């Protein structure tokens, strides 16, 4: 059985990871232009499309997430991220890359909703404020760290390295959630 503090940190890391997924590949957008040989407009459209889908997921699932099995929904979201990260890492076809990236946004949109629900369920009235504060800390670190991590991985291994990294982390998180 996992200690409740460890669970809270896992949930915080899930929030961090969801935000990381959104922001990690922006530093290599010019390289994607070279790799895929498509107009920069279409590469930028994957960024805007990703954000739009995450927002839609929040609206669509936001009202009903409390009535669903949180663990199954979270595993579904992580499963979508795993599959889409794998496809993004191995494809050399931009259309497949873009579609997979947009599916990745569906999984990414699920994660923070379930995380907040579980944080509320796992924390007591007295600890809820601290749990939410820690959640916000994790959440706000990702936009600062994602471009650094993305440019480091991208400089060495291009987009393949970035999406392979996301694949490995999402598999680890899936296994942790599955077994806890």
What does each model-identified segment do?
Residues 56-92:
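Conserved MFS/SLC helix-loop-helix module at the cytosolic interface between two early adjacent transmembrane helices
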């Amino acid at each position: 059985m996992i200690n409740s503090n460890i669970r809270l940190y896992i949930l915080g890391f899930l929030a961090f990871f969801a935000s990381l997924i959104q922001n990690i590949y922006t530093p290599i957008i010019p390289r994607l232009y070279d790799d895929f040989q498509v107009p920069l407009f279409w590469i930028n459209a994957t960024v805007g499309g990703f954000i739009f889908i995450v927002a839609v997921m929040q609206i669509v699932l936001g009202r009903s997430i409390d009535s669903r099995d949180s663990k199954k929904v979270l595993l579904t979201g992580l499963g979508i991220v795993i599959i889409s990260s794998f496809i993004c890492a191995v494809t050399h076809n931009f259309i497949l890359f873009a579609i997979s990236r947009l599916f990745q946004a569906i999984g990414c949109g699920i994660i923070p909703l379930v995380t907040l629900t579980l944080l509320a369920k796992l924390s007591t009235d007295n600890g809820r404020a601290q749990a939410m504060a820690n959640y916000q800390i994790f959440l706000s670190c990702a936009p600062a760290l994602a471009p650094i991590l993305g440019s480091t991985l991208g400089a060495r291994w291009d987009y393949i390295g970035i999406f392979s990294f996301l694949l490995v982390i999402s598999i680890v998180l899936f296994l942790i959630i599955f077994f806890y």
